[in-house]
Amino acid sequence: VVLHEDGEELLADNILLQCRSLGETGRNLLDQQREEEARRIVDRYTWISAGVVAATPLPGVDLLGTAAVNAQMVMEVAGVFGIQLTRTRAQDLALSVGRTLAGLGVVKGGVAIIGTTLSVNLPTLLLGRAVQGVAAGWLTRIAGASFITFFQQDQDWGDGGVQDVVQRHYDLNRRDRSLREFLETALRRVVDPLQQEAKKRLP
């Protein structure tokens, strides 16, 4: 009888362990799916920001940080993680990250990195618009990645605050491979259309 009971207990323990393992696997899969969906949203807004700013350049690069962080993007990313934000809360978060981008020197640093790369291929007349557009897209990408971290951590920036999260994603995005891949796409999606538009205007 004891052996029989022990065997049943062992079986029950094994079933519980398997259920927990399946639960953990399911959670990991859900987390992965959420992150992929959130990244797709950020990618979409990256190129929206780039296109809008390239078409209508801003009077100063200092405004790029604010222009790059869209409250609607924040709301959509939050929604992926099951969080419903009010428009006001999303705008506050967007403003906070926009200011952080400027305060950490990420805006000017990004413009410098992108300007150096694009100046090799572009005439001066197009350069300003192209740099602003591509930089806006790149900043949107950094801001979006920062928000994904924020919502993954249950709306918590962590011990280092928003500055640490933004700085980390800035550092990740300026690594050679990541930056090169982004710029290759930017040339195709932002710079080439600008050049085509300029050719059409020529007499």
What are these regions (language model features)?
Residues 79-118, 125-129:
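Hydrophobic alpha-helical transmembrane segments and adjacent short intramembrane/lumenal linkers
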Residues 24, 93-103, 162-175:
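Short, mixed-charge aromatic SLiMs
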Residues 1-46:
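C-terminal end of P-loop GTPase domains and the immediately downstream helical coupling element
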Residues 132, 144, 148-203:
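Acidic, carboxylate-rich catalytic segments that either coordinate divalent cations
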Residues 30-69, 95-107:
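Transmembrane alpha-helical segments and their cytosolic interface motifs
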Residues 65-94, 132-157:
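Membrane-interface alpha-helices
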Residues 5, 77-80, 100, 104, ...:
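Conserved, well-folded catalytic cores of nucleic-acid-processing
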Residues 51-64, 111-135:
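Short hydrophobic membrane-inserting alpha-helices and related fusion/pore-forming segments
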